[in-house]
């Protein structure tokens, strides 16, 4: 490996690492704000776990000296000192391991315990990913000077250029096993039989994440040549066009189905196109790349719809995008790959058969082992958070990380339960929630002031009524004792006082109704703003 090749692979490793930020933005924006911090920290933590385990023994299993094509040995706790080629190869592959692991995060978002997710991440990066990676990619280690004989799938002719199956499908199948074990989010599939759409908290943030992923994909596919070769520009063009094809197909489907172009299908469609081309970006012609991306997008859409029909709740459609499109992309090596470039010596039907074998083995291995492990673990250690914690949100229940919205709801809940009108919401004047909190405090100031005036008016009425009653009882009712002037007779006096009391009571009742209407209008605005996020606010008196 030349110096320029080493530099190129280092740059591509950085681009793949940047994809972690893309996944974090995408998943945080597609989930509710009460869970966004949890989603972000999962993407951060799983990277640390995956790289640590991959360095400890995962790299050795995947790229060590092959033991009959089933696992590798000899490179545990790998020391790359003085071997730049080995160092850059390890770094690049460690980033791939992190990508496969973080796909799981989005699928099972909003109901999985943080500690349980760390166990899933450890299983994925420490065993499932490196072992299947050995079967399909062990021979790549020769680039780093490791004398190995390749994995058994690889030796049969299975080809997956940059990981449609090895990376993306592995993560998707583990994610599918996880969400089947923990079940759907509360309210996702109500008893009415209809699927409830849970709106994400920040679509622009998700679009930013999609663009970051697209940018990182250039390093993902471009670096899989392990050098700055003449094939790299064509691979990058195929990558971009497949993403574009996926986006255009998703926009067309959305327009036909929903009579408008929605945001989520565009994002998922472009990502599905990128996943699909990942297996064959180096062996297909440019027009075919766009077809592969567009078809992968359509397949991901159909898989996502079918999962909803089956009651499977994937928070970000990770299984459809990375699993469905990953299967299609891997099969495309046999369907559309230029056989001289595929270079396995197989004819097209044989190549398709080997690709299907690899897809099936990956599904059985990744999904099967993850499902068995998590099902058994769930019997002794609850993987899912409690319904109460799910209602509050994982930001608070798992990390004690409050938000302005949560603090606003806390104050409103306390006021509803304690009837303490003196409570006020903390105000940050530079945020939208801060503006809402400020208006809420203004309403409560007015409500409290009117409440005090109402109490004073009622006290005055009580005093006048008590004085009249006492005077009548003592037969000493006199107008001047009550501060009433020019009263002609006792009957007129009592009638006037009765009318005054009635008018004051009606005025107080009308004032209370106005205050209640103002408060209800504010609460309805709050509930409308957060209804799409699935956050409930208990404001019952």
From Swiss-Prot:
Compartments where located: Cell membrane
Coiled-coil region list: none
Pfam families per the UniProt record, alphabetical: Ammonium_transp (PF00909), HAMP (PF00672)
One Gene Ontology cellular component: plasma membrane
PROSITE patterns reported in the protein's UniProt record: AMMONIUM_TRANSP
Any GO BP annotation: signal transduction
Claim: Zinc is one of the keywords in the record: no
Keywords associated with the record: Ammonia transport, Cell membrane, Membrane, Transmembrane, Transmembrane helix, Transport
Entry's transmembrane regions: 6-26, 44-64, 86-106, 117-137, 161-181, 203-223, 235-255, 260-280, 283-303, 316-336, 356-376
Keyword Transport: yes
Similarity remark: Belongs to the ammonia transporter channel (TC 1.A.11.2) family.
Protein name (record): Putative ammonium transporter sll0537
Lineage of origin: Bacteria, Bacillati, Cyanobacteriota, Cyanophyceae, Synechococcales
